[in-house]
Amino acid sequence: MKKPPLYKSLYAQVIVAIIIGVLLGHFLPETGTAMKPLGDGFIKLIKMIIAPVIFCTVVIGIAGMEDMKKVGKTGGLALLYFEVMSTVALLVGLIIVNVLQPGAGMNVDVSTLDTASLASYTAPGKLETVTEFAMHIIPMSMIDAFAKGDVLQVLLVSVLFGFALQKLGGRGTLVFDFIEKISHVLFTIVGFIMRAAPVGAFGAMAFTIGKYGISSLLSLGKLMGAFYLTCLFFIFVVLGIVTRLHGFSIWKFVKYIKEELLIVLGTSSSESVLPRMIAKMENMGAKKSVVGLVIPTGYSFNLDGTAIYLTMAAVFIAQATNTPMSLMQQVTLLAVLLLTSKGAAGITGSGFIVLAATLSAVGHVPVAGLALILGIDRFMSEARALTNTIGNGVATLVVAKWVGDLDMDKLHAELDNESPQAADQPEKILDQTNTKLGA
């Protein structure tokens, strides 16, 4: 099969768009800042389609299964994997920030920090209890879940609908067929939206550089360097070991989703590629029922990059302000972050909000210290989002293999394929999926 010209590749288009965005933001900062609506518009287009894509994917996957116990097993194993990997990510961040000590020697006086810009992040009530978090998953109505676009609420509605449709058996065939046809339409729309990805990446990058400036990276470069290094370590060592144990290569996997990663790099949001990741995971041999459960759930429960960021940023602030933290205090911070990190959906800036809420709740680290990293948080969000995206993809394949729903031959064939089919036309996935409604 002949490869398309390089200029037609989404991969190349996004790279060029990001470079142009950086140059515009650097040399014409006011113009670059004015490009913000382009990035925001692309993210809004993606969010517009996420809820119905999740609904159709989950419903088709569950309703097409004959063994309902397997759905429960898949969900349970996915949550187990999420908790283990989130804990590992938090520990990796905690260990490396203590070893490298990027904040040591800064000797920042907390009283001199400008905290006016932190008001919107440190408002009371930002931190949810476990009960509040569980209650939040239940929408006021089925329509409300889709209107808000809350991923976990949509997932709950989708799972219940899928179970009910499967229970109907043959009587639900017409509904099942209708939802499957809607899926074709939705993934076609995703294909249309993704053609605008270079424009969105350009706008978001031009705004970021124009507003914050490349020079702002230098002042806190030690923290950024340590954070990016830790993310790379987690991806290629920790996740590398996980993928090797499950029969595939992390290097080939990252290469396979390179276009998605570039879009994430440009937009700083892992949510921007959720529909494409669903398509790619199915094309790699994971069954729709597994993909539909693991990918959306992972956007709240499996944010490895955000977990690394939270521990590193908290301890960095303590180091920079000469705030001593005992081992027990760091363990307490870790325990609290295991809960609060679940509230950081894959949206730009959510990690900073969770960090502010956590520091307010724990009390060991001065919340005013957040002013130190507010200016560079936007630049660290790229690494967070990239790590989150890769982590969720790996989680999907691992859980699929655990429950016997991963075609290893297809996985290796796709990873060895230089031009993956799902790259530009994710709707083709549906043509390859002949799902039948369970009796």
UniProtKB/Swiss-Prot annotation:
Gene3D superfamilies: Sodium:dicarboxylate symporter. It is found in: Cell inner membrane. One of its GO terms (biological process) is L-aspartate transmembrane transport. It is a multi-pass membrane protein. GO terms for cellular component: plasma membrane. The chain crosses the membrane at residues 9-29, 45-65, 77-97, 145-165, 185-205, 223-243, 290-310, 332-352, 353-373. GO terms for molecular function: fumarate transmembrane transporter activity; malate:proton symporter activity; succinate transmembrane transporter activity. Keywords: Cell inner membrane, Cell membrane, Membrane, Symport, Transmembrane, Transmembrane helix, Transport. Its main location: membrane. NCBIfam families: PRK01663.1 (NF002461), PRK13027.1 (NF009587). This is C4-dicarboxylate transport protein. The gene is dctA.
